[in-house]
Amino acid sequence: MREPRPLIALDFPSFDDVKSFLAQFPPEEKLYVKIGMELYYAVGPEIVRYVKGLGHSVFLDLKLHDIPNTVKSAMKVLSDLGVDMTNVHAAGGVEMMKAAREGLGKGPKLIAVTQLTSTSEEQMHDFQNIQTSLAESVVHYAKKTAEAGLDGVVCSAHEVEAIKSATSNDFVCLTPGIRPAGSAIGDQKRIMTPADARTIGSDYIVLGRPITRAEDPIAAYQAIKAEWNG
């Protein structure tokens, strides 16, 4: 099921920055936010508790990638934090992903990273030594993720149709690299607009700078939300 709220990436370095940003929104506006490595490593689990305490939903984007036992234990901790969604690297393998699912339990959604949106096909060939197309690599990871019993994947919106065709329409596709029409590309090479992502079948979209660095973050969020919901 498509999430009607665009996820806001809280890419801030401090707790105070997060508090200041979220304070701009009225209490009745319940957001879905992404907490990534920078913020989580700077502040720790308390940032998740704080955001959840405000009534917002949390996608904890830590991209775990380790041996199955370690990932399982870490997921048990994240489950106790009350996260709504978290992720692992699909490259960790099916057994690692199964262990992650077991550790997290059945409540939160668990998705896997396929290829980062900053990765070009040339980089994948030269550095990862994967000699298929980028799209084929992503679909392969998605099929293995489904095999492991996870809910979906993080992927570029460009791969959504192929992924759902290879798995199922219920398989979740969360797409970063979303930018409102006319905005700067930044460091992500494969981008789409919210309207494009909706049309192509994305279930979740993630935006950071177009909202967090906007002159009026609330207006920017509402405009993107309206575009996402058509």
UniProtKB/Swiss-Prot annotation:
Keywords of the record: Decarboxylase, Lyase, Pyrimidine biosynthesis
A Pfam cross-reference name: OMPdecase
Disulfide topology: none
UniProt cross-references to InterPro entries, sorted A to Z: Aldolase_TIM, OMPdecase, OMPdecase_AS, OMPdecase_bac, OMPdeCOase_dom, RibuloseP-bd_barrel
Catalyses which reaction(s): orotidine 5'-phosphate + H(+) = UMP + CO2
Membrane-spanning segments: none
Complexes and interactors: Homodimer.
Protein name: Orotidine 5'-phosphate decarboxylase
Originating species: Streptococcus mutans serotype c (strain ATCC 700610 / UA159)
